[in-house]
């Protein structure tokens, strides 16, 4: 049976070189080794049949010059497309884009990646620029309009908050802070009108939605009761939050999975690993826990591949032909 990993990173040479020039990841996380051989080894261990590659944060925006950032996004996308073309049953990819404040460059890269390279979707990070500019920012509306028109799958991955100071030296930001950033970005989308105005996108939130499933009822209950309201009821806000898709990357534990499956709409949970950025043994521990977690067989099938095949028609055709 097919198993599709929708949260799976790679480091093309141009991206690794850009990170080295910048002195590493601003979040404090290490830059892990990545080769195609290492990638295929972990997928065998996880029994994954198809991997959707993506460039993780900070992405092309590590280049402060907008022209260089656009060129880096193009190079990453062409590297991903080459891997996919060599093994179309085993790989797909989410396209990288430069900073969303560079609207023209982003729209140009989305057009090229989706039309020429046939990307399976687009990666966006939780915020852009020097401030707390989350994905509901008014400047990003032309990009959301374009993605909605295309019916694009949008993979939202956390990046470092404005304040890069660590809790302490034991805790680089991806370990604990990133789920908060995902929750913040999701709430910004819910309360800025983006989801209502551009409903064509299918949005995947990383790491089981971060803090969103845990905190949505807190915010949704109070928002309609404030002096300044959105005009949405508690129930409408919660239902809007349930339209997101959620991957399981480094999130498979009894507390998180219970909350996620109670909250997410049916068919909206997808398997993810976070290779190579999570430690190898942690990836296998989370993967094995998910496999052993008691779920109805149809739900297991949806998590492994069914939900992803609904999102990625290219893969559905290929895997149906292969009878996976």
Swiss-Prot record:
It is found in: Cytoplasm, Cytosol. Zn(2+) binds at residues 7, 9, 157, 274. GO terms for biological process: patulin biosynthetic process. Its EC number is 4.1.1.52. It catalyses: 6-methylsalicylate + H(+) = 3-methylphenol + CO2. The gene is patG. It comes from the Eukaryota. Monomer. Patulin was originally used as an antibiotic and specifically trialed to be used against the common cold, but it is no longer used for that purpose since it has been shown to induce immunological, neurological and gastrointestinal effects. Genotoxic effects of patulin with dose-dependent increase in DNA strand breaks in brain, liver and kidneys have been detected in mice. However, more recently, it has been proposed that patulin might also have anti-tumor properties. This is 6-methylsalicylic acid decarboxylase. The keyword Hydrolase applies. Belongs to the metallo-dependent hydrolases superfamily. ACMSD family. Induction: Expression is correlated with the production of patulin. Expression is positively regulated by the secondary metabolism regulator laeA. Expression is strongly decreased with increased sucrose concentrations. This decrease is lost in the presence of malic acid. Expression is increased with pH changes from 2.5 to 3.5 in the presence of a limiting concentration of sucrose, 50 mM. Natural phenols present in apple fruits such as chlorogenic acid or the flavonoid epicatechin modulate patulin biosynthesis. One of its GO terms (molecular function) is 6-methylsalicylate decarboxylase activity. It comes from Penicillium expansum. Disruption phenotype: Completely abolishes the production of patulin. Keywords: Cytoplasm, Decarboxylase, Hydrolase, Lyase, Metal-binding, Zinc. The keyword Cytoplasm applies. GO terms for cellular component: cytosol. 6-methylsalicylic acid decarboxylase; part of the gene cluster that mediates the biosynthesis of patulin, an acetate-derived tetraketide mycotoxin produced by several fungal species that shows antimicrobial properties against several bacteria. PatG catalyzes the decarboxylation of 6-methylsalicylic acid to yield m-cresol. The pathway begins with the synthesis of 6-methylsalicylic acid by the polyketide synthase (PKS) patK via condensation of acetate and malonate units. Pathway: Mycotoxin biosynthesis; patulin biosynthesis.
């Amino acid at each position: 049976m097919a198993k599709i990993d929708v949260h799976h990173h790679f480091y093309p040479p141009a991206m690794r070189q850009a990170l080295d020039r910048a002195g590493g990841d601003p979040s404090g996380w290490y830059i892990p080794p990545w080769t195609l051989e290492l990638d295929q080894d972990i997928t065998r261990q996880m029994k994954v049949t198809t991997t959707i590659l993506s460039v993780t944060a900070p992405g092309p925006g590590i280049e402060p010059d907008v022209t260089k950032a656009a060129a880096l996004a193009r190079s990453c996308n062409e590297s991903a497309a080459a891997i996919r073309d060599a093994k179309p049953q085993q790989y797909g990819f989410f396209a990288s884009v430069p900073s969303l404040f560079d609207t023209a460059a982003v729209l140009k890269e989305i057009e090229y990646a989706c039309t020429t390279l046939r990307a399976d979707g687009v990666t966006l990070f939780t915020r852009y620029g020097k401030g707390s500019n989350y994905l509901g920012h008014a400047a990003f509306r032309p990009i959301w309009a374009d993605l909605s028109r295309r019916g694009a799958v949008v993979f939202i991955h956390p990046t470092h908050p404005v304040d890069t100071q660590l809790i302490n030296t034991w805790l680089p930001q991806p370990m604990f802070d990133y789920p908060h950033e995902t929750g913040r970005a999701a709430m910004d989308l819910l309360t800025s009108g983006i989801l209502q105005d551009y409903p064509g996108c299918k949005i995947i939130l990383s790491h089981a939605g971060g803090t969103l499933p845990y905190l949505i009822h807190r915010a949704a209950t109070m928002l309609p009761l404030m002096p300044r309201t959105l005009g949405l009821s508690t129930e409408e806000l919660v239902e809007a939050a349930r339209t997101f898709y959620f991957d399981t990357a480094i999130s498979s534990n009894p507390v998180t999975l219970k909350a996620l499956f109670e909250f997410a709409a049916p068919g909206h949970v997808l398997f993810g690993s976070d290779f190579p950025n999570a430690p190898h043994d942690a990836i296998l521990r989370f993967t094995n826990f998910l496999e052993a977690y008691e779920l109805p067989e149809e739900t297991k099938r949806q998590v492994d591949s069914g939900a992803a095949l609904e999102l990625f028609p290219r893969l559905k055709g290929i895997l149906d032909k292969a009878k996976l």
